[in-house]
């Protein structure tokens, strides 16, 4: 912002305010600023395609990003987190970025204590990983937006979250784009896209802000917008089977809102087992809602 001041209609974040600042919120939600949640943004722990590594656990990620991957940092009680033992090849963002903050919560590492080099921007992080000459030693935390479009050169790791007995990709397999494990809660490294808007005395945002956030936060999204969200590797809330609050990354609730999982499957996998429909009269009683051309429960 310049010194003359600008009118800010919307701020965008991957985080709840209380996740970003766990001790005190900068504002009281609903008093001077409103938080509108949009689509889901998954993140991936990624390695160069030439790496032989395919998986990582949250505990191993703690050893890497919290302890530099070396047993000596732990007093010699664990084995080194080979091959990730040189923080020079940890590709991260700063302590206020969504990728770092969400990972810090899951890996139990203070967000200001991450080992690695801040690559200053998301684009720079991605490009630095693509250019690395040390494929086996390199690991980074990427938005799925960048991970998906670079699958030929970067590989997302199976992530075993705390309490799980196996690891999961964001998708059902390495070749798909269905975000199935994000949508059903098996892969919890994700955040909502948040739109923060100042609100006036009447408790409503400016006309400009309202015109924007309404498009993303109404239950039934415009189909053109829905298509663009899906094409960007994001997950619209209507395609999620689970929801969660700011309190706990793994504390999921069933999504009882309007559903578009059938349409999402058709767009990402080219097929769906759902019943097509032109109106609700075409749908059976147990899937009575006709949403985006398919019968859904809600």
Show which residues each predicted segment covers.
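Flexible loop/hinge segments at secondary-structure junctions
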Residues: 1-298
